[in-house]
């Protein structure tokens, strides 16, 4: 996990970069896994494999999402606090689209909303869902609206099998630190919008 310390960001005053490994912490008698090398598996097919990166990770030369995807993650979620400046939303959109294309994955990008803005920084709730280089859903800036889309995980798995160069790029050292956590089956439900 990467901590920005440039331009308007001074996060190293309060935060330390995360570690790449994993730890298990006992919370109220239950062991809970924490770390930058976790992949959550959902369902019986083991195709929905979710990994997380945080804000600045996406903007670095070698984002953790590369390791996540090479270790099987089909969906990457980025929890962010990316501010608004001139031209940044277009750049951010291309960054998310490009990462989803390069990694042949679904990429969910969720950033801070306008209610989290201060006198120094403005957040616009620029939330995106991309799949393999295509924007599936995008929030209108400054609306704090929820976005949702269907990510075709079967297609992602098929595309990865078809690409002869996807698996050959896996460095064995990248696989050692990963832990796969099985999560409860996701229930399909219908949303009623009002």
List each language-model region with its residue ranges.
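Enzyme catalytic cores with a strong preference for nitrogen-chemistry domains
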Residues: 1-194
